[in-house]
Amino acid sequence: NNDILSDIMNGQFNDYEIINQSGINTSALEFSPCIYLDSLVYVANGRTEGRKSKSQAASYFNLYKTFIDQENHLVGETPLSGVLNSTFHEGPLTFNKEGTEVFFTRNNQVEGARNQKKMNLSIFTSTKVNGIWSKPIELFASNNEFSFCHPSLNSAGDRLYFSSNMPGGYGNYDL
């Protein structure tokens, strides 16, 4: 909402109450929230499911969801999807209006990248059919030279904005 952003930019917080959502806030990192149907989806690390150790869990970001109850409390954190989360980093993400398509950032797997100490980011997409997310597809699979990350759909859902370090920009990463 532009009014809320304007108020924040002008230092006017009196009409807003900041509530610590202790149901999901931890000593680890939680960020990049977005509304998805009746849930809040976000990126977090420090969770141990699928990880061999706590130190490994602290190192990787995955996608999580929590339900928003009738009093706007966040309840019951779960991984967003076993298909969308991998052994690499995931997030941030964006959904279409219908909640049937997601775009998200993931470390891409470039042959030999680990040996070269180079790991790029890619944008992946997945569609939800009959309640099940499809296997994610890399949008820019033919390009392993540059990173593509932080996707955001416009409100009409017909334009995808993202950040990249490909040539032709004005800095390291540009929209």
Model-derived features: positions:
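Short, conserved micro-motifs composed of acidic
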Residues: 1-175
